[in-house]
């Protein structure tokens, strides 16, 4: 798979491939598919990009309490989904297809800034995450993130993350 520039109507990463890279599992795995991915190839002129999505269903555990009579997908879950998509972008930019490397690495998010929630996300929505690399130096990544439902901006944030060695605890 050439991940330097991959796009189209078919997913380039399904949930099985995502689970090989991210350590998250149900109920906290918040990316269902990756539709587009451009590896970041330049630190001086960042060009990395990812488009991924999560299908929000009424079966999400979070709706048991948020809110039972008017379910709204929490903003914090939207940000976590953005962070997971950003982790995929950073990992693939650094290690390509080498999913074996994922066992030794973990992505930590350091800051989340300029968060805005614009429109509620509800069951039945497809939450589309679009992230681009703003800056990259070594293992540190700064990402601009937007989330959309039906092409309407529902939330946005700037994220800073680092990829580091995973330590056994």
Curated annotation (Swiss-Prot):
GO terms for molecular function: (3R)-hydroxyacyl-[acyl-carrier-protein] dehydratase activity. It is found in: Cytoplasm. This is 3-hydroxyacyl-[acyl-carrier-protein] dehydratase FabZ. Involved in unsaturated fatty acids biosynthesis. Catalyzes the dehydration of short chain beta-hydroxyacyl-ACPs and long chain saturated and unsaturated beta-hydroxyacyl-ACPs. InterPro entries: FabA_FabZ, FabZ, HotDog_dom_sf. The gene is fabZ. The keyword Transmembrane helix does not apply. NCBIfam families: fabZ, PRK00006.1. Transmembrane segments: none annotated. Keywords: Cytoplasm, Lipid A biosynthesis, Lipid biosynthesis, Lipid metabolism, Lyase. The keyword Lipid metabolism applies. Its EC number is 4.2.1.59. It comes from the Bacteria. Pfam families: FabA. One of its GO terms (biological process) is lipid A biosynthetic process. The active site is at residue 66. Belongs to the thioester dehydratase family. FabZ subfamily. SUPFAM superfamilies: Thioesterase/thiol ester dehydrase-isomerase. Gene3D superfamilies: Hotdog Thioesterase.
